[in-house]
Amino acid sequence: LPIKGMIGLSLGEYVALIASNALSFEEGIKLVADRAHFMQQDADREISTLAAVLDPQLQEIQELITAQQENNQRVYIANYNSPQQIVVGGTLTDLKATLKKIEEDNLAKRTILLKVNGAFHTPFFNGARQQMHNRLQTVDFHEPQIEVISNTTNSLFHCEDLPGILEKQLAVPTHFGANVKELVKHAKIDTTLEIGPGKTLSRFAHQVDQQLNTQHIENLADYEKFIKEQKD
């Protein structure tokens, strides 16, 4: 298939980089295992969590969170997934206070506390970020053979940028929605193929651009069906 570009959300970014030959499969597996270990250490050190915010009034929520931070509340936007969903993280107390304010001010259709043990992609994971900085210096990276757009910068990965961006990714927001827009604009795509369990990313992609033909492969049967359809 003529693949024009790839995106992976959070951990999935490593899958995209492996598929693009920016790093080997063996090195990639070791690297994500170490990444998980570093993140678990931060998660154990201080309790934090995430909440999804559906149909957000983004500018108003950004202003609210800035005000909360100025009031010494530890709450941050963690993921900009699509025009219809962002994810906010923080300590449980501060996060609940922020969600309550969002609901009182009608700044979103709905908020949902997520069952996770960390406010990923926020400063709560600065410790893991520092450990990844050191670990990434040992990795033999290569120029991606297929273009991969970074969650962090919304620009194409290049070999020399990989260590710095992957380190930073742990503690700053992801921008999947903007990544999809960039892929449509830069690579002129009209079809996306999500590989993995569930169809969450396909849903985000469709929310970004309703003209996209979103396809999904979850298992071998899906793969064989997809390949047959392409041949036909």
Language-model region placement:
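Glycine-rich beta-strand-to-loop/alpha-helix junction loops that act as flexible
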Residues: 11, 91, 195-197
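Conserved alpha/beta-hydrolase "nucleophile elbow" surrounding the catalytic nucleophile
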Residues: 8-9, 80
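Helix-rich "cap/lid" substructures immediately adjacent to catalytic or cofactor-binding pockets
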Residues: 1-7, 88
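Alpha/beta catalytic cores of group-transfer enzymes, especially the acyltransferase/condensing modules
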Residues: 20-171
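Acyltransferase/transacylase module recognition
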Residues: 1, 140-232
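Glycine-rich nucleophile elbow surrounding the catalytic serine of serine-hydrolase chemistry
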Residues: 9-18, 22-23
